[in-house]
């Protein structure tokens, strides 16, 4: 045992205590993942050493054969996972093994529901890593020394996972980290050579460095025909394939191997939704292995959270989270790139304005969109699952990626008046295929909620004529539509914003009936404008309504109601919006208003109709007290 000095006891960060408790209770049905997590970390440590040694070869300390070793001590009831990777110094041990240095941590804990299955999935997304050791261990001892440090700079970390840990200085001749798990009494099944070999084969076959286990000496024996079978000396042997999975031919890699590799790079517990493995040759050469997760990570909307792909150059790990190879609207994509063209000393700054980077980014973006198109075409139910998780992120695409705007638009899904449901399952291609003869626009409405969109008076004329309207109620929709102007050469038109042009969908008989109705209430618009004054830009008759007496419409050159709400919610200054007040000349209330000779009552009715229309469109009023007063006055008059 190493000499121990300068020993200190520290308390775990509160979040670590919570995570340890959650893991022990939520992951007990999948205990063996502890080995996957620890072997995965050991492989990452080897990758990091290989990268650092590119600029400082002495870090290898004469030992460049990187590997992970698993050993068992049945008498002590322990397993040890050791690596000769980058290692840690005292400060790193305290930071990495005592805290969770991850943005969005509090958000993660607030999302936990108490439902074991859901929580275990969420914990998997969070990435439990090292702490998974406590699923099976009652005590964990970590000994580590950073590559390049003296043997006297070793550090030992010990904990029973119950609130605190001790850290001490030790002598450690070899660089790297060894983790010893003292197994709980009911977990001793893991202190078995064949059990560990089967777990490594199941979860870690794809790890690109060898995972070694000790094979005992096999004495000389007699063969079936009496010949002597020579003795085999004891030795360390690799129990995994130890080749970089992404360099292998697609036909040689099983679905199970792809799934386990995804879990290795993403630390997700769930299988991916779909993946794409490609070898690109020609002007730019690289391998890519891209995965679309089945579930959105809890921190997808956290601006501080890094997103991106693992980057390798000539099979040497360079960095995690290389965001330059994927547009922001595809930030949920996991995977890796292995380039033959980038320099080994590449940095994030070099990647920023690099032609090779741009070519790879374009290629990877195209691959992901093609993957999604295939899923949407071949398995609509699976695609709806994807849309429920990532639809709002994909809606950022048309604004960010002009080159692929049409492709992204084809992947979008919306609710529609075609279905009596808030399910977003109508594609733009579906809509276009159902367009009426003479229809040249794609009509849509944006609102605070599906219910508000569905019950908007602006839909009335479309229902009457049987014209489909897309119902949009996500916060991102208004912003999306400001960047999405057409699809399949059909332009979009908001039914609440600007003039309503039904083009050839308006028949001559309808137009004549409209003109006749307007004659019956001639002069009304001028009287109403006099009452409302500067509150409105214009008062006019409309035929977009069939059941409602009036509506307000945002000016075609100004902001829509939803955009104003978005900007106000973001604390942005918003110019005063002027609306057009539109009256339905065929409605009995409007006819009654035209016949009203008492100017005071006329004013009150006008204000009430305007406020009703504003309430329907905006969801609130600037002066609700005045609305209530006018309404009460009119009700009292009617009651007399």
From Swiss-Prot:
Coiled-coil blocks: none
Record's keyword annotation contains Nucleotide-binding: yes
Function as written in the Swiss-Prot or TrEMBL entry: Molecular chaperone. Has ATPase activity.
Protein name (database record): Chaperone protein HtpG
Span list, region A: 1-348
Pfam name, any one: HATPase_c_3
InterPro entries (alphabetical): HATPase_C_sf (IPR036890), Heat_shock_protein_90_CS (IPR019805), HSP90_C (IPR037196), Hsp90_fam (IPR001404), Hsp90_N (IPR020575), Ribosomal_Su5_D2-typ_SF (IPR020568)
HAMAP family: HSP90 (MF_00505)
Region (C): 566-640
Classification of source organism: Bacteria, Pseudomonadati, Pseudomonadota, Gammaproteobacteria, Alteromonadales
Domain of life, source organism: Bacteria
GO MF entry, a single one: ATP-dependent protein folding chaperone
Region (B): 349-565
Entry-linked Gene3D superfamilies: 3.30.230.80, 3.40.50.11260, Heat shock protein 90, C-terminal domain, Histidine kinase-like ATPase, C-terminal domain
Subcellular location: Cytoplasm
Gene Ontology cellular component terms for the protein in this record: cytoplasm
């Amino acid at each position: 045992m190493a000499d121990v000095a300068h020993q200190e006891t520290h308390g775990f960060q509160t979040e670590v205590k919570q995570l340890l408790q959650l893991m022990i209770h939520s992951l007990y049905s999948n205990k063996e993942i502890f080995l996957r997590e620890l072997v995965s970390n050991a492989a990452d440590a080897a990758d990091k050493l290989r990268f650092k040694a590119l600029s400082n070869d002495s870090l290898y300390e004469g030992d460049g054969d990187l590997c992970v070793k698993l050993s068992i001590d049945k008498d002590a009831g322990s397993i040890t996972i050791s690596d000769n990777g980058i290692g840690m110094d005292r400060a790193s041990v305290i930071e990495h093994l005592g805290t969770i240095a991850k943005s969005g941590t509090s958000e993660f804990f607030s999302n936990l529901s108490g439902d074991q299955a859901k929580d275990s999935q969420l914990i998997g997304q969070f990435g439990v890593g090292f702490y998974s050791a406590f699923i099976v261990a009652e005590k964990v001892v970590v000994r580590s020394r950073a590559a390049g440090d003296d043997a006297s700079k070793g550090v030992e970390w010990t904990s029973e996972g119950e609130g605190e840990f001790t850290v001490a200085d030790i002598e450690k001749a070899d660089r790297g980290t060894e983790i010893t798990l003292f197994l709980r009494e009911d977990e001793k099944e893991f202190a078995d050579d064949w059990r560990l070999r089967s777990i490594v084969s199941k979860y870690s076959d794809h790890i690109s460095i060898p995972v070694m286990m000790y094979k005992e000496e096999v004495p000389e024996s007699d063969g079936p025909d009496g010949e002597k079978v020579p003795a085999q000396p004891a030795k360390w042997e690799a129990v995994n394939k130890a080749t970089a999975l992404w360099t292998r031919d697609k036909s040689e890699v099983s679905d199970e191997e792809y799934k386990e590799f995804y879990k290795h790079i993403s630390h997700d517990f769930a299988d991916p939704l779909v993946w794409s493995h490609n070898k690109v040759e020609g002007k730019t050469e690289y391998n890519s292995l891209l995965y679309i997760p089945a579930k959105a990570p809890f921190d997808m909307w956290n601006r501080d959270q890094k997103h991106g792909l693992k980057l390798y150059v000539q099979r040497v790990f360079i960095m995690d989270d290389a965001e330059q190879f994927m547009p922001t609207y595809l930030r949920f994509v996991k995977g890796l790139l292995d380039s033959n063209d980038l320099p080994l000393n590449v940095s994030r700054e070099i990647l920023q304005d690099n032609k090779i980077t741009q070519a790879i980014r374009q290629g990877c973006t195209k691959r992901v969109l093609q993957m999604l198109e295939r899923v949407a075409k071949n398995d609509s139910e699976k695609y709806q699952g994807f849309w429920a998780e990532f639809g709002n992120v994909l809606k950022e695409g048309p604004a960010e990626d002009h080159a692929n705007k049409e492709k992204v638009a084809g992947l979008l899904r919306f609710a529609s008046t075609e279905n009596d449901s808030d399910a977003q399952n109508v594609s733009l291609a579906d809509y276009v295929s159902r367009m009426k003869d003479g229809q040249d626009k794609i009509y849509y409405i944006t609102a605070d909620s599906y219910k508000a969109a569905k019950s908007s008076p602006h839909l009335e004329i479309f229902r009457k004529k049987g014209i489909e309207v897309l119902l949009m109620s996500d916060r991102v929709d208004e912003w999306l539509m400001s960047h999405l102007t057409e699809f399949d050469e059909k332009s979009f038109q908001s039914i609440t914003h600007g003039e309503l042009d039904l083009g050839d969908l308006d028949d001559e008989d309808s137009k004549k009936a409209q003109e006749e109705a307007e004659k019956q209430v001639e002069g009304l618009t001028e009287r109403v404008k006099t009452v409302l004054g500067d509150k409105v830009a214009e008062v006019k008759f409309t035929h977009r309504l069939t059941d409602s007496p009036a509506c307000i419409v945002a000016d075609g050159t100004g902001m829509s109601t939803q955009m104003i709400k978005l900007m106000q919610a973001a604390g942005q200054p918003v110019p005063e919006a002027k609306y057009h007040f539109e009256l339905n000349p065929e409605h009995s209330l409007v006819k009654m208003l035209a016949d009203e000779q008492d100017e005071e009552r006329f004013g009150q009715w006008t204000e009430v109709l305007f406020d009703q229309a504003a309430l329907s469109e905006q969801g609130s009023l600037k002066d609700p007290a005045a609305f209530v007063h006018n309404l009460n006055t009119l009700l009292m008059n009617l009651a007399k």
